[in-house]
Amino acid sequence: MDRSKRNSIAGFPPRVERLEEFEGGGGGEGNVSQVGRVWPSSYRALISAFSRLTRLDDFTCEKIGSGFFSEVFKVRHRASGQVMALKMNTLSSNRANMLKEVQLMNRLSHPNILRFMGVCVHQGQLHALTEYINSGNLEQLLDSNLHLPWTVRVKLAYDIAVGLSYLHFKGIFHRDLTSKNCLIKRDENGYSAVVADFGLAEKIPDVSMGSEKLAVVGSPFWMAPEVLRDEPYNEKADVFSYGIILCEIIARIQADPDYLPRTENFGLDYDAFQHMVGDCPPDFLQLTFNCCNMDPKLRPSFVEIGKTLEEILSRLQEEEQERDRKLQPTARGLLEKAPGVKRLSSLDDKIPHKSPCPRRTIWLSRSQSDIFSRKPPRTVSVLDPYYRPRDGAARTPKVNPFSARQDLMGGKIKFFDLPSKSVISLVFDLDAPGPGTMPLADWQEPLAPPIRRWRSLPGSPEFLHQEACPFVGREESLSDGPPPRLSSLKYRVKEIPPFRASALPAAQAHEAMDCSILQEENGFGSRPQGTSPCPAGASEEMEVEERPAGSTPATFSTSGIGLQTQGKQDG
């Protein structure tokens, strides 16, 4: 079979082998009908993504995971040996979302956004090739027995916030932000997080323009309350999902309400959750509570989240360095007194550290920094107008609001919808990354762009949010030395400058393009996922006082070991 036919799919153009074929040149009879043709922008966007088209049999595949709509393989190119990840769509009704995801990823370039590598066609379907992330996802990392100090946890939270801030600045929000879609990369500098899975991403609606209400999509455990109630929502829904992820990071528990306490109105049970935080930095816990606020207007933006986490991370690193300086003389004295201490043999390293049925380890012990210095008390306030603490003497069992609604099926489903024309239009309007951002591999054939012979009328400016990301393009390091600064020029993000305390950049106008696309009929499908049981974490003794309606918010005081409820109101 001819290769051009083998690499084509219904509704999509075959791979262009020569520039003359795209432009209608070459002098062949088959190109006569193409002379002078004005190609629509949707076709040109696909050509850009298809410039790195490959076949499945060009790779060796190893399955490493699966989701509701796709299976993920670790693939190695037979010729070059390059390792990538292949996301194979398994649901025919999800083809439109897969196509949109490919087009969107092809126009995003940021160290905390999963990097697009190319596309693969197999059995008439389009599949995305991305960079391979070597340490799984955030949910798997938190479920492991690895000890994660607070500096590492805050750094991972910072990476996710920076990636989402970049996405929001581009005028798009994720709508399916979960700990499963945050991938973990490990290198010589430690752990870093990368945001993935943009199949449900949508253009941020403009309330002033009377935008159409968006459909209910996402994973229920992480969905914002306004989304679950089928109310109008915007990018602040991503902030609530991020808050649930922060709860997972702090307590190292699953987002399942059987482990993470929730309220009947799909909010976070702050009073119950504070028993599970151990020696969490109070300002980190305060940020988590702010993100989980039931009122979308009271949730911070990812710009504010990133700045707060940057301050927290800097303080934790200073405390860690101070603790190391105090530990060095003590460790030296112990070695002088006990020179005969012998290290365990290498055979002990081979003993498995986990039982056949692993159970989640929740790190609730005091940090070593508490041994040397007593931290001053700090307060954590709950400013959620829809939250009422329960009376400690009449506590009710844990609430699972997802079991009360039949349509949510216990929360173990995933809602999806066809992409709207607005997000497709925005995808085509986004500037593609520069050629230096994603170098082609040896097996990838570069495709020269066609000569522009047409001009569209000027369009209205793109609806980018003005709260730009001053820290986008930076990547913190867990090493002892100063973190490297990655400027926006390196990642070809023209709209976002590197971190400065200057004013925010204004949105840039983009050229209007034809946004027509064929849409298939959508079906509703779900694939329940099994959940592994984990023990509830040890909680600390607390006294909880109920606040009457209309009173000031409850205030929780912390002094380095657990949290205690103050008997007086703020102010």
Curated annotation (Swiss-Prot):
Q: Give the UniProt tissue specificity note.
A: Predominantly expressed in testis and prostate. Found predominantly in non-germinal Sertoli cells.
User: Where is the protein localized?
Assistant: Nucleus
In this chain, ATP is annotated as bound at: 64-72, 87
Q: How is its activity regulated?
A: Activated by autophosphorylation on Ser-219.
Reported EC number(s) for this entry are 2.7.12.1
Q: Which UniProt keywords apply?
A: ATP-binding, Kinase, Magnesium, Manganese, Metal-binding, Nucleotide-binding, Nucleus, Phosphoprotein, Serine/threonine-protein kinase, Transferase, Tyrosine-protein kinase
Which GO terms of the cellular component aspect does the record hold?
Answer: cytoplasm; nuclear body; nucleoplasm; nucleus
Q: Which PROSITE patterns match?
A: PROTEIN_KINASE_ATP, PROTEIN_KINASE_DOM, PROTEIN_KINASE_TYR
**GO BP annotations listed:** actin cytoskeleton organization; focal adhesion assembly; protein phosphorylation; spermatogenesis
Q: What does this protein do?
A: Dual specificity protein kinase activity catalyzing autophosphorylation and phosphorylation of exogenous substrates on both serine/threonine and tyrosine residues. Phosphorylates cofilin at 'Ser-3'. May play an important role in spermatogenesis.
Write the protein's name.
Answer: Dual specificity testis-specific protein kinase 2
> Which organism's genome codes for this protein?
Homo sapiens (Human)
- What lineage, starting at the top, does this entry show? Eukaryota, Metazoa, Chordata, Craniata, Vertebrata
UniProt gene name = TESK2
